[in-house]
Amino acid sequence: MAEEQVLNTHNASILLSAANKSHYPQDDLPEIALAGRSNVGKSSFINTILGRKNLARTSSKPGKTQLLNFFNIDDKLRFVDVPGYGYAKVSKSERAKWGKMIEEYLTTRDNLRAVVSLVDLRHAPSKEDIQMYDFLKYYDIPVIVVATKADKIPRGKWNKHESVVKKALNFDKSDTFIVFSSVERIGIDDSWDAILEQV
């Protein structure tokens, strides 16, 4: 079923930003969290699959997202953009604070249905990417791995890069893996299929 028949994906807005659970929305709408390294393309992913240009702000300055940003989609679903990890210029104490905030959300939020874990298709996953995937598997949280920036690689090499990413993550075949490009609009339907399957 096409996503337009399920919900109007263009009817989306940023709802609120939260530093801890006391600020989370108090209802039972399903939520999909988005996690990934700084500058992996989370904001571009959100904007692309929602068909909006600047709903999630893209930044040339990594580490800009410092709160959990909740996006309301047609009053039926929420995306939760979590702070990008792996940015060296953020202080150790700040990184620890973000880590605690992300962990609290991922392990205690009943609304959470799945996590879209974004990785860069061009490179082997970072230590933080692997830690995030392992964390989600440990807590039995459904994972959708989205490999971004596919347009930067010739199509003939996608399978090779996908294999490298999956091997490094020790990828569970029961999870979903999607090759994605915001520039070429590749992987949008597959992403929605995977998301809606979880909600």
Swiss-Prot record:
Positions of the EngB-type G domain: 28-199
GO terms, molecular function: GTP binding; metal ion binding
Keywords (A to Z) from UniProt: Cell cycle, Cell division, GTP-binding, Magnesium, Metal-binding, Nucleotide-binding, Septation
Cofactor(s) the record lists: Mg(2+)
Residues involved in GTP binding: 36-43, 63-67, 81-84, 148-151, 180-182
Binding site for Mg(2+): S43, T65
GO BP annotations listed: division septum assembly
Any matching Pfam family: MMR_HSR1
Gene3D superfamilies for the chain: P-loop containing nucleotide triphosphate hydrolases
GO CC aspect terms: cytosol
Database matches in InterPro entries: G_ENGB_dom (IPR030393), GTP-bd (IPR006073), GTP-bd_ribosome_bio_YsxC (IPR019987), P-loop_NTPase (IPR027417), Small_GTP-bd (IPR005225)
Cross-referenced HAMAP family: GTPase_EngB
UniProt family annotation: Belongs to the TRAFAC class TrmE-Era-EngA-EngB-Septin-like GTPase superfamily. EngB GTPase family.
Functional note: Necessary for normal cell division and for the maintenance of normal septation.
Protein name: Probable GTP-binding protein EngB
Biological source species: Streptococcus pyogenes serotype M49 (strain NZ131)
High-level lineage: Bacteria, Bacillati, Bacillota, Bacilli, Lactobacillales
